[in-house]
Regions:
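Active-site microenvironment for binding and transforming phosphate-containing groups
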Residues: 6-186
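Short, exposed "boundary/linker" segments that immediately precede the start
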Residues: 1-4
Length: 186
């Protein structure tokens, strides 16, 4: 066990927040100023982060808004976001030494933020979907999260083609594989 990083992380006491991120930075062997945060508003907007962005959202004010995904090929830039019941999507392109992180809530999932981020990595770095390593964090399950009929209908229209494909759990893995990935592990 390396420490409690979540105590007071969402409190209004900035000193507690900075202390918790300093602890995490120490364990990761980076500086707190290396973190770059999203400005999550449930969009599919992706931003390329570089050295000038380090500290944004933690030790410096964000100079951008409405960003739910970050990509970089710059060593020393630590992509970061906040998650509760939304789904973290991680991407690594070992060929072009680039990474991506997306915050995928129900709106981002519906709008296929995973595919949008993969396309952006292709535009910026030459990433090919078949070269990507993708990871999905654990997420809230359908037993613990109920959606309205209106939201369920939107998902059915976009994702469900037959009874076998039904289920919120399968949407993000399928979304990631659609842009051309040959397979996955796990």
């Amino acid at each position: 066990e390396v420490g409690d990083w979540s105590s007071d992380v969402c409190s209004s006491d900035l000193n507690n927040v900075l202390e918790n991120f300093s602890r995490m930075a120490e364990v990761l062997e980076v500086k707190i100023d290396d973190f770059v945060f999203t400005h999550q508003t449930h969009t599919t907007n992706i931003r390329r982060a570089g050295l000038k962005d380090r500290g944004n959202g933690i030790t410096a004010a964000l100079d951008y808004s409405d960003i739910d995904g970050l990509i970089t090929d710059t060593p020393g830039v630590v992509l970061s976001a906040f998650f509760a019941d939304c789904i973290p999507l991680y991407f690594a392109d070992p060929v072009h030494k680039a990474v991506g992180l997306a915050h995928s809530g129900w709106k981002g999932t519906l709008d296929k933020i995973g595919a949008v981020l993969i396309a952006k990595m292709g535009e910026e770095f030459g990433t090919r979907p078949e070269d990507l390593i993708a990871g999905i964090e654990p997420r809230i399950c359908q037993d613990c999260y109920e959606v309205s009929e209106e939201v369920a209908k939107k998902f059915k229209e976009v994702f469900i083609t037959d009874k076998e494909n039904a289920g919120f759990k399968a949407l993000n893995p399928a979304d990631i594989l659609r842009p051309g990935r040959k397979g996955h592990r796990g």
